[in-house]
Each structure stands twice: as C-alpha cells, then as structure tokens.
Amino acid sequence: YHVLGNHDMKDFGYTKEETMKWWKMKKRYYSFDHNNFHFIILDGNDPNPKPWSGYDRYISSEQIEWLKDDLSKTLKPTIVFSHQSLEAKGGISNREEIRKVLETITNKNGQPKVIACLSGHHHADYVNSINKIHYIQINSMSYKWVGENFKYKRFSNKIEKNFPSLSKT
C-alpha cells in the first residue's frame, strides 16, 4: 500500500500520474479492510485553491466527500494515513476541515470511528491526541539526521552497535 508524498513527485521531476503508475496505484486515495480494522489512505497533494506558494498540501472537496462517504459506511475502528500531517502546521493546509470530518462521523456509542492518523512529512517522531484521535508522526524513512547532540537510545546494544546511525534519526 502506498501513500503519495511531496518528495515522490516534484522533487524528482515526476507527475502524480507517473508516480502512481510506477507504484501500480489504481487510485490516489482509497480504503481497505484488514482483519478488524478499516484503513484509509488520503492524498494530501492536491493544489490549494487559494493563492499558494510552495508544494501542494491540500485535500480537495471531492476527496473530502469521498472520505465522509467511506467513513459513514464502515463499522470498524479506522486508521488514516496521509503523507502530510492532519494535526500540525506545515501539514495539510485544510487540516482543521479534515479533522472535523474525522471527529464528527462517530460510532453508535458517540466515539469517533477514527482512532489514529499516521503521517511522516515532518521527519520527526511524536504523538499528539486531539479530541480522542491519536496523531502519530513517524520518521521511519527520513533523510533528517539530527547529529550527536540529539542521540537517542531506543534499541538493544547489539543493534545500536551494528547500526549506529539509528540513534541520530
């Protein structure tokens, strides 16, 4: 499963369509069920309709309507993936509108169907919770090396010895 990110296209001179073809993606946003969970993949690379500079980081009204429809049809706990964050500045420019959708489509008990949103755009590791939804930023494929002053021990001594750069990501 793939999530389109800004570095996958413009940074390397590829169009969204070329990137999707290379990854064999049939759709740029989609959902699927696995075991007892529902997964939604969003494309946060739509052009912003307002005057904008920089890379595209917007979710279109067409995609928002699809999201509402998709969420309303599932009864399973849902995890949302997007390259750009749905909670932080520098993420999806209309993130507050998207969060409102995620928070208002609830299960019968009134709890949000969405339990977590994962992203990686900010190249950092952290978790933030907003209105009962966990927003998880993962630095798993980052080119951001923070250096000796920010070393962090989280693996066994053997792994740290064999892969010393892990402590600086």
Regions found by a protein language model. Name each.
Residues 5-6, 83, 120-121:
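Active-site glycine-centered loops adjacent to acidic/histidine catalytic or metal-binding residues
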Residues 9-13, 87-92:
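Acidic-and-aromatic substrate-binding clefts and catalytic sites of carbohydrate-active enzymes
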Residues 70-89:
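Short acidic, glycine-rich surface-loop motifs adjacent to enzyme active sites
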Residues 92, 96, 121-122:
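Alpha-helix N-cap/helix-start capping motif
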